[in-house]
Design a protein with these regions (language model features):
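Conserved phosphate-binding/catalytic loop of the ribokinase/pfkB sugar-kinase fold
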Residues: 1-11, 34
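Short catalytic-loop micro-motif centered on adjacent basic/acidic residues
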Residues: 1-2, 24-26
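Glycosyltransferases and closely related glycan-assembly transferases
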Residues: 10-23
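Conserved phosphate/ATP/ADP-binding segment of small-molecule kinases
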Residues: 20-22, 30-99
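Short, well-ordered turn and helix-capping elements at secondary-structure junctions
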Residues: 27-29, 104
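Conserved phosphate-binding/catalytic region of the ribokinase-like
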Residues: 65-183
Length: 183
């Protein structure tokens, strides 16, 4: 997982990896504006890029998220996640699309860090899988959304610090029943 860091540092980290199985990267507007050439080089070398709606549009000059995802895939990564804040995220893989909603909450205390929690939960879930299938990525997206739902309930990482697998799995089951989809 190449976190939202200076693209030069991301490239240094990437170059230190020996035969990585699956590389995920995150970025932000500042790096897109100021380090575009280096950023494009990194994008071409990863398996999945995770961006929010604004970043996807900025990288591709397209208003359509589907078109943005296709353009990002053409840059190198076969998989794209576009985070949509309170509206969840969309996973694009080859010609498949999976939209995962945000977990419905009555109260949101602070959304700061929810996107980072989402991609961290996604990466953690995916790392436990024996295969990197679309089904595994769908499950990882649901896990990421469930983890992000805890992040927004408190300031900072307080809610995550007390999160257990039992609580997380309970939320995933509740999520599944609320949205009525198979994972």
């Amino acid at each position: 997982m190449l976190g939202n860091l200076d693209p030069n540092l991301q490239l240094d980290v990437l170059n230190q990896m020996k035969n990585p199985k699956f590389v995920i990267m995150d970025t932000m507007n500042f790096w897109i504006e100021g380090y575009r050439t280096k950023l494009d080089e990194i994008i071409s070398k990863v398996d999945l890029i995770s961006v929010n709606e604004e970043e996807a549009r900025q990288l591709t000059n397209s208003l359509s998220l589907i078109d943005s995802a296709k353009k990002l895939q053409a840059m190198g990564p076969k998989n794209v996640i576009i985070k949509k804040g309170e509206h969840g995220a969309i996973l694009f893989s080859d010609k498949k699309i999976f939209q995962v909603p945000a977990f419905p909450l009555k109260k949101i205390f602070d959304p700061t860090g929810a996107g980072d929690s989402f991609i961290g939960g996604f990466a953690g879930s995916l790392s436990e899988k024996k295969q990197l299938s679309f089904q595994a990525m769908k499950t990882a997206a649901v896990t990421g959304s469930a983890i992000a739902s805890y992040t927004v309930q408190q300031f900072g990482t307080k809610e995550l610090e007390n999160l257990t697998f039992r609580k997380l799995n309970k939320r995933i089951k509740e999520f599944k029943s609320l949205t009525n989809f198979e994972i």
